[in-house]
Amino acid sequence: MAVQISKKRKFVSDGIFKAELNEFLTRELAEDGYSGVEVRVTPTRTEIIILATRTQNVLGEKGRRIRELTAVVQKRFGFPRGSVELYAEKVATRGLCAIAQAESLRYKLLGGLAVRRACYGVLRFIMESGAKGCEVVVSGKLRGQRAKSMKFVDGLMIHSGDPVNYYVDTAVRHVLLRQGVLGIKVKIMLPWDPSGKIGPKKPLPDHVSIVEPKEEILPTTPVSEQKGAKPEVPVMPQGAPVPTA
């Protein structure tokens, strides 16, 4: 017999499950460009779609790695055998995914690249991918013993209001270097896309669209037309009998 739980508890348990799953996959697939997870629940099974930039690495040789991940998720969250399926989906626009770019910057810094050069490289790639604006902040012991932060900004970025929730993609990552831990924050402002593929369908509240006037079709032959003339009232002849109702 299924245990009945309230709607509030159901929302909380679903949120905890997704947060734990996201944390686990972030640790496991950080090197494979992990960018997020989607959970689809059907009456018969639960489908977990892993979004990554390198899907081949997520799948592994002959699908071995994805099977191992499925077994771990099944055991950890108590799913019945065969009721959970894991899929790997490639991120369509890597440059517009804040998580992918934060991980990219993290590995650049781990590789020994200078902070300024690494940040400008990420900034340029994001803007070339079609973003309206981006902001990269790196903080920590960048030079010397005193901690400071460096901010790199390009394009347009909104910071307040409801549109921030669906127009700005944010990611925070930490990287452990010899001098200490550096914090990385990447914010990307997505472009407006009516199809909803690379950005939100809903335009910004202050967006102004100018409608082009319709083309006026000119007549090929000259036409004379009398406009605004009063209709002529028929004059009754004198001596005619007046009609009565």
UniProtKB/Swiss-Prot annotation:
Localization terms from the record: Cytoplasm; Nucleus; Nucleus, Nucleolus; Mitochondrion inner membrane
Reaction catalysis annotation: 2'-deoxyribonucleotide-(2'-deoxyribose 5'-phosphate)-2'-deoxyribonucleotide-DNA = a 3'-end 2'-deoxyribonucleotide-(2,3-dehydro-2,3-deoxyribose 5'-phosphate)-DNA + a 5'-end 5'-phospho-2'-deoxyribonucleoside-DNA + H(+)
Biological process per Gene Ontology, one example term: regulation of translation
Similarity remark: Belongs to the universal ribosomal protein uS3 family.
Broadest EC class assigned to this enzyme: lyase
Keyword entries, A-Z: Apoptosis, Cell cycle, Cell division, Cytoplasm, Cytoskeleton, DNA damage, DNA repair, DNA-binding, Lyase, Membrane, Mitochondrion, Mitochondrion inner membrane, Mitosis, Nucleus, Ribonucleoprotein, Ribosomal protein, RNA-binding, Transcription, Transcription regulation, Translation regulation
S-S pairs: none
Domain KH type-2: 21-92
GO cellular component, one term: cytosolic small ribosomal subunit
Molecular functions (GO terms): class I DNA-(apurinic or apyrimidinic site) endonuclease activity; DNA binding; RNA binding; structural constituent of ribosome
The protein's name in its UniProt record: Small ribosomal subunit protein uS3
Species annotation: Ictalurus punctatus (Channel catfish)
Region Disordered, residue ranges: 215-245
